[in-house]
Amino acid sequence: MTPSTSHISSQLRQLIYYHLDNNLARNALFLAGRLHAYEPRTSEASYLLALCYLQNGQVKAAWETSKHFGSRGAHLGCSYVYAQACLDLGKYTDGINALERSKGQWTSRNHWNKHSETRRQHLPDAAAVLCLQGKLWQAHKEHNKAVECYAAALKLNPFMWDAFLNLCETGVDLRVSNIYKMSPELYSMVSSAALEDVESQVLPPDGPLQTQVNPNPSLDPFTAGTTRSDSTSTHGSSALWEKLNGSTVSVASSGTGPHLPREGMETPGGQSSESDDPRVTNGNGTDVFEPPLAPAKKNRTIQTIGGDHPMDPPPKMRPTGIRPRTRTKFESDEGHTERDAGMGHRLGDRKRTVSGQVAHPSVPHSTDQGVGQRRSVRLFNQIKPSTNKISSTALGVKEGREVKKVRTTGNKARTTTSSNVGRVVSGNNRRHAGEIHDGDSKEYRGTSSTSNGSQNASSKLAISERTKSVEALAWILDLFFKIASGYFCLSRYKCSDAIQIFSSLSQGQRETPWVLAQIGRAYYEQAMYTEAEKYFVRVKAMAPSRLEDMEIYSTVLWHLKNDVELAYLAHELMDVDRLSPEAWCAVGNSFSHQRDHDQALKCFKRATQLDPHFAYGFTLQGHEYVANEEYDKALDAYRSGINADSRHYNAWYGLGTVYDKMGKLDFAEQHFRNAAKINPSNAVLICCIGLVLEKMNNPKSALIQYNRACTLAPHSVLARFRKARALMKLQDLKSALTELKVLKDMAPDEANVHYLLGKLYKMLRDKGNAIKHFTTALNLDPKAAQYIKDAMEALDDDEEDEEDMA
């Protein structure tokens, strides 16, 4: 017998998702190749093959495989993989166009809170697609459109963290509190998710079969499934039943199994449709296909019915939440014989009666006319049994489990179709059936009392679960708000605020590598290298293999002139990953500290080869070119850094430095101001602007910049020194003396400070103090002896030496 085409592809898809979920990418790729060979024209096979190529790092192959369906927007999965490959390959416009053409397939999707250990959605939702679209626009230098995409993604899913990070990198102003707050949409989604969890866990109390309502037809081996959702009970109306369901019942191809949950499924396996609703295959190789279900075994002998030891149940599927159509006991089996017989070839694995008719389902929702439907049943219409007696599988119910269900039916109460079940079991439980019919009045009383108790318990559990879920979501939102606020402040170089926010986190969240690294970066941006080193040391101790932010750590060690630790860090990072740009930056900084600029340049070039978007690597190249006085090459390196990241202020600072050395003061001032616009709290950049203005004989404007720098960094020796010098040029000697006295206490061993004090006392005609400070400067810096001696010899001269030693 030739196997079903749909079942072969279904099994292959199930195996592919199994290996993907277990991170066995090579196995998944091989199986995806088999599926694509079996169904070369289907978009689903192309999507899975392209996805496996992408998981294996074969970006070009993923791009080629997904191009046919992805570039046209014919399949959402193909378009998504195609766009991801385009992002890596630099084909940004192609990826953007592909996502735009598939917009109708993802614009209404929202899978937030629909993923768990047992559920998955293998196709992306709107938030994921918008985030990818934002990355493509950002790489294409269309920052406004990128911001729109990131904002839309965060509105749908505030936990799309990389969308928030990229939004911060664009430099746009944000109100973080508006992102991480409990919106009505979030509240609704988390409440519904909590309700589903309750429905999947609540087990009705023991009692007659009428009280153990099983609204999910997929859990009843005798129920013919239907794909239509949210229909009401017919309560005996055969005409309404046929109006709602049509002349035939819609089931999966060949009747291999019940329908899957609307919102997700257990793994292994995955929804193969492009919508959230389950779809079935038509068997001709088109894109309409069933979810990957395992077919039930057929041709079991009649002896199986009498088995006392059924096979172990496969993993349970989540209930679908689809309300099944029901029949009442007033509907005769003979009235539907022709319809059931017409379904026989598709429901070949279902139980049949002795006469050969397909067994009708036991009624899941309707009871006797005298018994009203329970409120708890209406509220929770997806109860998943957890006992062995009534559990079954959504991946194809085996006969062993069916028999157990039948025996349970016989031992307990009977629904309104008890006559049908009696024929199915061929008399095995007729005695019990008679007993049940004799005790109808007792059944009614038991049903009523059990229904009230179940209703109260279910309602209380639902309220409790919803409350706990909302509280948990509020806690996570508050955590994300704090972390996001800290990162946003750091991206705006409000370093003190960032440190304060990160420090306010709970100890468990604060003492993590990522948070500690951000605090270290904040201290680094403030030029507080000793404090920054302390945090990076803790990061390295917690995560020895961490590469992120290690280029900053190596620069901190370079500033601290800690050659030994810098060399050790470089060796450690190379052992972790020789192909990481951070490792090569650390090696380059080590060579730079040893004044081996050529070797340092080679290392920094290697870093940018490994990652062409690594802006800091280009900036470090520029610094080395400046050290070698190769200014033209330095300009090219800094411009490459700006091209990689337009908000990388270090590259703008480098350009200003080069133009300053070349004597192009106007260009230098412009680039220093560009850098200060990005990082307005950096005192060094403000001092650079003041220095250029001072060289342009504009000491008043320079003094304004120096005052601003001293306000930003009160402990900055450089800012206070240049402020004192500007005051001396403006003949404000008393203010200059005040600044220098403070500076002397801050840096008592700085020769330039004592030299400037000597000059100031000379201007004040205080020769004693002038000689004292000149002598101190001479002792601290013997290399500047010539300058200091000339100043001491000119004590009696009225001419003022405007030069300093630096």
UniProtKB/Swiss-Prot annotation:
Residue stretches of each TPR repeat: 76-109, 127-160, 513-546, 581-614, 616-648, 649-682, 684-716, 751-784
Region (Disordered), start-end ranges: 202-348, 353-372, 401-460
Keyword match Nucleus: yes
Compositionally biased intervals (Low complexity): 246-257, 446-459
Alphabetized UniProt keyword annotations: Cell cycle, Cell division, Mitosis, Nucleus, Repeat, TPR repeat
Feature: compositional bias, Basic and acidic residues: 328-348, 432-445
Coiled-coil ranges (or none): none
The keyword Cell wall biogenesis/degradation is annotated on this UniProt entry: no
Main localisation: nucleus
UniProt cross-references to InterPro entries, sorted A to Z: TPR-like_helical_dom_sf, TPR_rpt
Highest taxon, organism lineage: Eukaryota
Function field: Required for the completion of mitosis in Aspergillus nidulans.
Protein name in the entry: Protein bimA
Species annotation: Emericella nidulans (strain FGSC A4 / ATCC 38163 / CBS 112.46 / NRRL 194 / M139)
